[in-house]
From Swiss-Prot:
<dbReference type="InterPro" id="IPR008991">
    <property type="entry name" value="Translation_prot_SH3-like_sf"/>
</dbReference>
<keyword id="KW-0689">Ribosomal protein</keyword>
<dbReference type="InterPro" id="IPR005880">
    <property type="entry name" value="Ribosomal_uL2_bac/org-type"/>
</dbReference>
<dbReference type="Pfam" id="PF00181">
    <property type="entry name" value="Ribosomal_L2"/>
</dbReference>
<dbReference type="InterPro" id="IPR014722">
    <property type="entry name" value="Rib_uL2_dom2"/>
</dbReference>
<comment type="similarity">
    <text>Belongs to the universal ribosomal protein uL2 family.</text>
</comment>
<dbReference type="GO" id="GO:0015934">
    <property type="term" value="C:large ribosomal subunit"/>
</dbReference>
<protein>
    <recommendedName>
        <fullName>Large ribosomal subunit protein uL2</fullName>
    </recommendedName>
</protein>
<feature type="compositionally biased region" description="Basic residues">
    <location>
        <begin position="207"/>
        <end position="220"/>
    </location>
</feature>
<feature type="compositionally biased region" description="Basic residues">
    <location>
        <begin position="259"/>
        <end position="277"/>
    </location>
</feature>
<comment type="function">
    <text>One of the primary rRNA binding proteins. Required for association of the 30S and 50S subunits to form the 70S ribosome, for tRNA binding and peptide bond formation. It has been suggested to have peptidyltransferase activity; this is somewhat controversial. Makes several contacts with the 16S rRNA in the 70S ribosome.</text>
</comment>
<dbReference type="InterPro" id="IPR002171">
    <property type="entry name" value="Ribosomal_uL2"/>
</dbReference>
<feature type="region of interest" description="Disordered">
    <location>
        <begin position="207"/>
        <end position="277"/>
    </location>
</feature>
<feature type="compositionally biased region" description="Polar residues">
    <location>
        <begin position="27"/>
        <end position="48"/>
    </location>
</feature>
<dbReference type="InterPro" id="IPR012340">
    <property type="entry name" value="NA-bd_OB-fold"/>
</dbReference>
<feature type="region of interest" description="Disordered">
    <location>
        <begin position="1"/>
        <end position="20"/>
    </location>
</feature>
<dbReference type="GO" id="GO:0019843">
    <property type="term" value="F:rRNA binding"/>
</dbReference>
Length: 277
């Protein structure tokens, strides 16, 4: 992926940058692998806002992604690398030898014409999916299962990868992108390599309109509201919030308050939390 910048013809183009989409080889999605995606606009079934700052945005077709990689021991050819509006990563269209078509997350350096395969006996190559116990120490992996057969749930964002650091008993230890170190059952599958399109973090929107196209509405600070609207509101000019610490619009502690359930069963599998130095 390359980054394209603009001359400052307008204030919006002065700072803006976009992907050059040089890695995209097919512009229209595979029709059989798409479905309609209803946008909830941040509302629940009663029409009440449950997630603020959402609404508008361009309509999207959802691409059905194969996170399970459960088509074992059947080779597939990479037919195209495509854009997906629902995620930062690119997706790869696979043609299996038996005629089935599927989308997967496109790893970095995966080329059109390459062959990928999943299974216990799959070779150690980019894009192949193997059980964690078959992957060598020090390897980069992504799309990692937490429960065998459920499908990849971790490390799916553009440019992300986890590292296999140890194997002991029925568990494999991984270092995640957040620096958290945790154990995962050895029979869980993961895909070799890191997710592509890593330069997406270097893009700049340049103007508010591009954020609105993505379905994001303005995020207004509580300190500039009235007291009726937010606990931080009110006062003369730029007044302090008048509390020991910041809170949400509903008065609960925010910005650093722990939200993880202390009794969560998976806590015993986490060796080092992400927020520990």
């Amino acid at each position: 992926m390359g980054i394209r910048t603009f001359r400052p013809y307008t204030p919006g183009t002065r700072q803006a940058s976009v992907s050059d989409f040089s890695e995209i080889t097919k512009t229209q999605p595979e029709k059989s692998l798409t479905t309609y995606k209803h946008s909830s606009q941040g509302r629940n079934n009663r029409g009440v806002v449950t997630s603020r700052h959402r609404g508008g945005g361009h309509k999207r077709l959802y691409r059905i992604i194969d996170f399970r990689r459960d088509k074992h021991n059947i080779p597939a050819k990479v037919a195209a690398i495509e854009y997906d509006p629902n995620r930062n990563a690119r997706i790869a269209l696979l043609y299996y030898q038996d005629g089935e078509k599927r989308y997967i997350l496109a790893p970095a350096d995966l080329k059109v014409g390459s062959t990928v395969i999943s299974g216990e006996d799959a070779p150690f190559e980019i894009g192949n999916a193997l059980p964690l116990w078959r992957i060598p120490l020090g390897s980069e992996v992504h799309n990692i299962e937490l429960v065998a057969g459920r499908g990849g749930q971790m490390v799916r964002a553009a440019g992300a990868s986890a590292q296999v650091v140890a194997k002991e008993g029925n568990y494999v230890t991984l270092r995640l992108p957040s620096k958290e170190v945790r154990m995962v059952r050895k029979e869980c599958y993961a895909t070799i390599g890191k997710v592509g399109n890593a330069d997406v973090r270097n893009l700049k929107l340049g103007k508010a309109g591009r954020s609105r196209h993505r379905g994001k509405r303005p995020h207004v600070r509580g300190s500039v509201m009235n007291p009726v609207d937010h606990p931080h509101g009110g006062g003369e000019g730029r007044a302090p919030i008048g509390r020991p610490g910041p809170v949400t619009p509903w008065g609960k502690p925010a910005l650093g308050a722990k939200t993880r359930n202390r009794k969560k069963a998976s806590s015993k599998l986490i060796i080092r939390r992400r927020n520990q130095s």
